[in-house]
Design a protein with these regions (language model features):
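Active-site-lining helix/loop region of Rossmann-like oxidoreductase modules
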Residues: 21, 150-278, 283-287, 299
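C-terminal helical cap and adjacent loop that interface with cofactors, partners, or active-site loops
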Residues: 266-326
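Rossmann-fold NAD(P)-binding glycine/threonine-rich loop
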Residues: 111-130
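N-terminal Rossmann-fold cofactor-binding loop
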Residues: 46-50, 68-69
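ADP-ribose/adenylate-binding Rossmann-like module
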Residues: 99-117
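N-terminal Rossmann NAD(P)H-binding glycine-rich loop of SDR-like oxidoreductase domains
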Residues: 19-36
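Conserved Rossmann-fold cofactor-binding substructure of NAD(P)-dependent oxidoreductases
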Residues: 68-82
Length: 326
């Protein structure tokens, strides 16, 4: 949604002050390292532990502050003089985002939880810009899907595939997020075979509730959108999603699987995405696909998030909530 132009940096200059919540976490820390290389912004590292925030901030040339999402008394001091807040933690409600919009502070978020992003869309800020669907998935996958959809007269469906290596070191929050969705009793049971580029071949993908499929269905003229996940090991993929189906809703098995995923370390740190868009063009049925391949999911997510965020900083600020592909 668009609600007119947003304000300039609060300093009155072209220099922005960017506060990264969760800035010393696995993805947030990598984003901070990338943004710290820019000479046109001031970086603030924020988190619940002020000592960790200060120590990490010193290592990247920024400053650290305490910000606890559960303690509203920390919000105003931490956000004083801030132009942008880049959120690298999942939230349970809109209190903090509403606070930012009331202050005219701009907002970006790397979460992959559609329920929260839909709630942010509903706030429709008039003085702030919000950038959501940031990173790899959502983020790059949205852009890939939009690119494919733009080449068709009518889009019938969008299939998004994510392929992860088991040699990667994923953050605890990311593993917990994925385990929650694999063992979700309401998880879509559909399975799709999809081709990945760069020699990865065809893979069997299992549905996972990433937000990209939902935001694309809301913002692009498509009949359907779907996101699935596979791991580099076909055996591990079948075993994990088989457990998710057999023990759907079991907190115990969810926790056991999360522990196994955290400790399991074999294969490569592969991180790939494939997007297939099918539909009609000039009266003929056509399909197009786009592939991406990288290594180390946290690093890829951070680099893409920083790049997408930097693109917004370099352009005009438009109030309202915008997905990356918009």
């Amino acid at each position: 949604t668009t609600a007119g132009e947003a304000g300039q940096p609060r300093s009155g200059t072209s220099r922005n002050t960017v506060l990264v919540v969760g800035g010393y976490g696995s993805v947030g820390g990598l984003i901070c390292q990338t943004l710290a290389a820019r000479d046109d912004l001031d970086l603030v590292v924020a988190g619940r532990n002020p000592s960790k925030a200060a120590a990490f901030a010193r290592s990247v040339g920024g400053r650290g502050v305490r910000l606890d999402l559960d303690d509203q008394s920390t919000w105003e001091p931490a956000c004083r003089g801030v132009d942008w807040v880049l959120m690298c933690m999942d939230q349970t409600d809109l209190s903090f985002v509403s606070f930012l919009f009331a202050q005219g502070i701009h907002y970006a978020d790397i979460t992959a939880s559609d329920g929260f992003l839909r709630a942010v869309e509903g706030l429709a800020p008039r003085r702030s810009m919000a950038l959501i669907s940031v990173g790899l998935a959502p983020g790059l996958t949205n852009i890939m899907a939009a690119w494919g959809a733009a080449r068709l007269d009518r889009v019938e469906r969008i299939d998004i595939g994510l392929l992860f290596g088991l040699g990667d070191r994923h953050g605890e929050a990311a593993i917990g997020w994925l385990a929650d969705r694999i063992f979700d009793s309401a998880r879509d049971g559909r399975v799709v075979d999809m081709a990945f580029g760069f020699g990865a071949g065809r893979r069997t993908l299992y549905a996972v509730d990433f937000s990209d499929q939902h935001s694309l269905a809301r913002t692009l003229p498509t009949d359907a959108a779907w996101t699935g996940v596979a791991f580099e090991s076909r055996l591990a993929t079948a075993a994990l999603f088989g457990m998710g189906r057999a023990f759907a809703g079991s907190r115990l098995m969810r926790d056991v699987s999360a522990t196994v995923m955290k400790r399991l370390r074999f294969g490569s740190p592969l991180c790939s995405a494939s997007v297939a868009v099918s539909g009609w063009s000039k009266g003929e049925r056509v399909a197009t696909s786009v592939h991406f391949s990288g290594a180390v999911e946290a690093r890829v997510t951070a680099q893409l998030a920083a790049l997408q965020f930097e693109q917004v900083l370099s352009g005009p600020l438009v109030a309202g909530v915008h997905h990356t592909h918009q």
